[in-house]
From Swiss-Prot:
This is Clostripain. Residues 28-50, 182-190 form a propeptide. Heterodimer of a light chain and a heavy chain held together by strong non-covalent forces rather than by intramolecular disulfide bridges. GO terms for biological process: proteolysis. The active site is at 231 (nucleophile). It is an enzyme of class 3 (hydrolase). InterPro entries: Pept_C11_CLOspp (IPR014173), Peptidase_C11 (IPR005077). Keywords: Hydrolase, Protease, Signal, Thiol protease, Zymogen. One of its GO terms (molecular function) is cysteine-type endopeptidase activity. Belongs to the peptidase C11 family. It catalyses: Preferential cleavage: Arg-|-Xaa, including Arg-|-Pro bond, but not Lys-|-Xaa. Cysteine endopeptidase with strict specificity.
Amino acid sequence: MLRRKVSTLLMTALITTSFLNSKPVYANPVTKSKDNNLKEVQQVTSKSNKNKNQKVTIMYYCDADNNLEGSLLNDIEEMKTGYKDSPNLNLIALVDRSPRYSSDEKVLGEDFSDTRLYKIEHNKANRLDGKNEFPEISTTSKYEANMGDPEVLKKFIDYCKSNYEADKYVLIMANHGGGAREKSNPRLNRAICWDDSNLDKNGEADCLYMGEISDHLTEKQSVDLLAFDACLMGTAEVAYQYRPGNGGFSADTLVASSPVVWGPGFKYDKIFDRIKAGGGTNNEDDLTLGGKEQNFDPATITNEQLGALFVEEQRDSTHANGRYDQHLSFYDLKKAESVKRAIDNLAVNLSNENKKSEIEKLRGSGIHTDLMHYFDEYSEGEWVEYPYFDVYDLCEKINKSENFSSKTKDLASNAMNKLNEMIVYSFGDPSNNFKEGKNGLSIFLPNGDKKYSTYYTSTKIPHWTMQSWYNSIDTVKYGLNPYGKLSWCKDGQDPEINKVGNWFELLDSWFDKTNDVTGGVNHYQW
């Protein structure tokens, strides 16, 4: 399917001559060394003592209107099993089902193909009325919501905040995000939540783009923890988009995976089983925090403890099934701005010292790369759609190379330090020398000059021409595929023409051969 989709892109590019269609990308994952994790335990314990009776509302945005319906219903069943009834913890789910993939009647009491609200409790799910915030939904309605519409997400958050007021809000978004759950869709890494029952103007399942969420949600919908139960969302671009203080929707912390996520997703029964009144411990070793695994009281649980829960239980679950290729990271998004500043400073210096060829040697091309990466290096389609590389590994290899100046190495070292601060916990593939708490966040680094072609046409088109979604502008306005408007690409741009100010401008200066007033292939004049 990926090959067919990319071929369609190529054909559209030919029809529109100098302009082209393409698709966006995103990323996420990381963990600390044992010493750092133990220090974190002390920090989060002291934090939790400040509020001994907090309320926590967890919002589960469940887009099951696609071929993940069976898997997502299983996730809800896991939640019902693991959830411990508590006046301090509410678990609210917006569930959109499909008429095509599952006829299950047990998980939610009946089979349906519309959109419903539920309060998840121990071994049961109670259907809810949407009230003023979501009047289309009642306990008897047949309303079909478009989960790819940001206004639906906005309504859901507003409903939860109005009717289940809390001191801490967690938003879990579950569906396709790029990879494992349907690796063949080239849009998966730039967006999330595909709704098969609601098509966009191109006749494809509608979805939520990163920039689109920022355009529609506001600071009012912000959350304490944002978790993507989806693939390829652990990127620097995604993390920066939703950093606190951006003036709109944000999250203080983030749970996400840089590579693809296996089909079962998060292990919700184990996660919720460890959120219980009174806390305590079990007899399992905790490789994330050290010692034995702790249970956390919802009345005092912190963002860091929640993040550690997701990371540790995903590690346990995937490793128990022999899947050592899986990753998950927990990020402190308050540190995302300093990471971006460090990467942008490095980008400016790479431009000033004309180090394109040296970076390309590190990155590699075709079927070989020595950099830690989160895509299939043997697939040219994936080189086009999501060439995501581990940021820390890139900076570390720059720092160790003899082909860069001492200034460049110092800037790379500074970026490594900032990444270490942002990546609180992470785990990854030990065979790739994954460093917990350092590796696990990706960045877009394409082979922009390479030309792509298929048996559909002999015309060869540079990868960068097909990657115009990676942009600061409104790409739809210029006839390109959605969505652009990435804060990572916009912030830090140098106002002077032909002068690099950030990572995006560095890539555009390397790969866009036409930088006149038209902005070249992606309509952006760096």
